Amino acid sequence: MSKGKPYIDIRGYHKGVTGSCIRNTVHFSDGKKFRFLVDYGMYQGEGHHGIEYNDSVSPEKIDTILLTHTHLDHDGALPIFVRKGYNKDIYMSDASAAVIDIGLMDSYNIMKRDAKLKRQPILFSESDIEQTIKQIKAVKYEQTVKIHSNISVTFLNNGHLIGASAILVQIDEPGGIINLLYTGDYKPNNIFLDIKPFPSWVYALPNLTIISEATYGSTNSWEVAHTWEDDIIEACSRNQLIFNCAFGQGRAQELMYRIRMLQDAGNIPKDYPVLIDGTTTVSYTFRYLDRSNIIQMKEEAKNFLPYNIQFVDNKSRPALLEKKNRAIFISTSGMGSHGPAATYIPHFLSNQNALMYIPGYASEGTLARKIVEANYGEEILFKDGHSVIKKAEVKQTGEFSSHATADQIIEFFQHFAPLSILLNHGEPKNKEILEARVQKELGIKKTGILGMGYVYRVNSYGIDKAVEK
């Protein structure tokens, strides 16, 4: 590294798809440093218990935090960081700032419950969430802000989730210019939002390194079958009971909107009961409606609630468990193991007139995965000790994924002239496959995969070297 030239050390702390945290250390030409994080999330999924996070980052050594979006695997550890002493700014889009409290409070309530049931620790308090929110700096899309006299940041719209951002970081000093684009979890479109191209000046940036997700680095868009709507139409024509597992933020609202559009088109009856269960689903649904202007929802999408909708609570749920036909349920959790879904599934699985849908990924060990993989007529044992014979039809689709497929990521890269590309957020195999494709199809040789133990040093010419630490 030439003396007097700025560079940045980039380290990813997550090998897979959860626990997102990228530490960035800017080294200026005068020897001074500025450190910022992109995201600070919890580890989730099989083998984790909702209390794991990267605890190797010291709050006193971080100068600012940039948040790409409000999924707990990206923002869930922020109150822990604040509790440990972080007292500086947390930048995010204004749409993310409008909803971030819902997920953090839900995480806190789950921790309180698990503290009693499983004797697990409570890692932060309600006051820590309140303090975290006080430190938020809400930024509009395409608004450029200074986080240091030589560092500018611009949040750019992203279809992954309402409020999600790709984040452009520009380091500019006499010794050199470095441009960095962090995609976050990226998708080029969103049913609720008008996702516009980035400003032309962003695509034209020189000295650019892209730090991109690679969740579906081995999957192409033409490999994903779109079956859900046809299946729902067919099931409604048969007066079936339809049960959908759904994540409370984003996925549940999209399913509601798609049902509403099927109703408006006359494809399913408007009087078909639509039952929504899950506290986070209800909270996000009404927050989206209340803050639709901040969220910049498309005008036609603001009426996303289906006809004949009912929001379910603990009091009304027991009677609904006895339903045998003619109803559409949408319930958390997305993988079936938690929330009301864990109660509904054992009741509905033995119903020959039920269609049970998993509209997303189901990880190993989850209830959704178990019922998808079980054969018809197989006996399924539940955690409480009772068993049920699988008689319902169980289907799964990947069409609602909020992540770009590999071909969409390659197409996204083609709008730029990057000197180098770093990949993160994906299983190791998917990152390796996408890296090889980037090198072959785009001719970019300066590539790397972020992971524990490695720091990539980036300067005005892209990746300079990888340092093992």
Which residues does each PLM region occupy?
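Short, solvent-exposed amphipathic alpha-helical segments in soluble enzyme
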Residues: 25-27, 170-172, 197-200, 227-228, ...
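Hard-cation-handling environments
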Residues: 228-367, 424
